[in-house]
């Protein structure tokens, strides 16, 4: 049975633990490389959750008649630039 995908909080907590282990600097090279690869994967999981949340955010604005309109908020210019950069 496939392991369920982590939620954002689980992925972020594990990513923080991986970073802490790597920053410690006492790992053998092979273990450090394995943790680095895991961290990249966790970073991508977190990024997907954040992108999904960003797409769901809606802002309320008043239309010209004073009514309330629900409008989807698109990604920020910085977020669009970041997604165009490949690692």
From Swiss-Prot:
Enzyme nomenclature, EC number: 3.1.11.6
GO MF assignments: exodeoxyribonuclease VII activity
Family of the protein in this entry: Belongs to the XseB family.
Gene Ontology CC terms: cytosol; exodeoxyribonuclease VII complex
PANTHER family recorded: EXODEOXYRIBONUCLEASE 7 SMALL SUBUNIT
Catalytic activity: Exonucleolytic cleavage in either 5'- to 3'- or 3'- to 5'-direction to yield nucleoside 5'-phosphates
Listed name of the protein: Exodeoxyribonuclease 7 small subunit
Function in brief: Bidirectionally degrades single-stranded DNA into large acid-insoluble oligonucleotides, which are then degraded further into small acid-soluble oligonucleotides.
Subcellular localization(s) per the UniProt record: Cytoplasm
Gene: xseB
Enzyme class label: hydrolase
Subunit structure: Heterooligomer composed of large and small subunits.
Alphabetized UniProt keyword annotations: Cytoplasm, Exonuclease, Hydrolase, Nuclease
């Amino acid at each position: 049975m496939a392991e369920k995908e982590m939620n954002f909080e689980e992925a972020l907590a594990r990513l923080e633990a991986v970073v802490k282990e790597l920053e410690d600097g006492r790992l053998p090279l092979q273990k450090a490389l394995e943790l680095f690869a895991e961290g990249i994967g966790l970073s991508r999981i977190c990024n997907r959750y954040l992108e999904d949340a960003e797409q769901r955010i809606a802002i309320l604005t008043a239309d010209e008649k004073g009514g309330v309109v629900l409008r989807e908020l698109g990604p920020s210019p910085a977020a669009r630039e970041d997604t165009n950069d490949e690692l």
